[in-house]
Amino acid sequence: MPQKLILASTSPYRRELLSRLGLAFDVANPQTDESPIFGESPESMALRLSEAKARAAAQAYPDALIIGSDQVATVNGNIYGKPGTHERAVKQLRELSGKTVNFFTGLCLLNARTGEAEVRGIPTLVTFRELTDSEIDNYLRREPAYNCAGSAKSEGLGIALMSSMRGDDPNALVGLPLIALCDMLRKQSLGVL
């Protein structure tokens, strides 16, 4: 019997990206503590949390293939998470103005039946233009990116804040690296094509 595919995320962006592959899947809320561990690197945190989300969903889906993903944005070791409010988003964008940000996306595919997990990290470097307060305010009023690490949606109007982007998979920046995921699914005998 083929294994059910589960996306361990409540993110509408990840759900939309996964739906592009044309595979049937269900969504699970992973209920994971996303607090950083003292001394943990941002990259290690994203990898740990992507696997933790998949393993949390395995409690309800012990026979499934489960996808977990997590993303952190960093500049000089400082982590920029989801701002949550307009004021924090303004502060983040002021701090990121003119800087290159490392968006690191952790991806896990867990075979809950066997307990085996494959975990990968996909970096994307984004350079923000020098932003004026007026541009920041106009952007956030038109596209309140309060639930996005770094306060900008590259798949929307946020692209206007950026001067360059470097990475292997543009989907990684949105939160689900589809190139790596397709490879991982093939290894589990679930080909997309």
Curated annotation (Swiss-Prot):
Belongs to the Maf family. YceF subfamily. This is 7-methyl-GTP pyrophosphatase. One of its GO terms (biological process) is nucleotide metabolic process. It catalyses: N(7)-methyl-GTP + H2O = N(7)-methyl-GMP + diphosphate + H(+). It is an enzyme of class 3 (hydrolase). Its cofactor is a divalent metal cation. Its EC number is 3.6.1.-. It comes from Dechloromonas aromatica (strain RCB). One of its GO terms (cellular component) is cytoplasm. The keyword Cytoplasm applies.
